[in-house]
Amino acid sequence: MEHTRSGSDILVRIDPGEEIHTVLKELADDLGFDAAAITSGIGRTRENSYGYMDEEGVYQRRSLDPPSELVSLSGNIARTEKGDAFTHIHCCWSDDDNNVLAGHLFQATVHVVAEIHIRVMDHASMTRCPLAEFELSLIHI
């Protein structure tokens, strides 16, 4: 991973074999920010796990293992109540037949490259707190 920063904007290049959530949490820790918007991301990933939350508040997971084009990625980076970096990301992929798949991102390993733009909110604080009745952590602003 490499990154460059200009004011509140960070452009991150994530390299083959690196996992997106892991790299972005490490970046938040290394740079010391508590609140950021992930505004865009493109690239090619593999071993993708994504899904949606059903009516009962339980995430339903899907796998997309072959390398696929990451056509859109967005979300945010906050902190847990214990101070750990927490990423919340949604993605859209296109498979090799141009079928689009999308949802909440659980895991994605970069296959070729991922290029992600982050906007740090220097004077903001966002904390993720568990919501007991759902498999979810709400953001407190």
Residue map of PLM features:
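Structural motif
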Residues: 9-11, 35-39, 68-69, 89-90, ...
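Mid-chain, well-packed structural core segment of small domains
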Residues: 64-105
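Short, structured patches in soluble enzyme cores that scaffold and shape functional sites
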Residues: 16, 93-95, 118-122
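Structural signature of FAD isoalloxazine-binding scaffolds in flavoprotein oxidoreductases
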Residues: 106-120
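Generic N-terminal amphipathic, Lys/Arg-enriched alpha-helix
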Residues: 1-12
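Conserved small/polar residues in nucleotide/adenosyl-binding loops
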Residues: 139-141
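Short, well-structured hydrophobic secondary-structure segments
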Residues: 15-71
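C-terminal binding/interaction regions
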Residues: 136
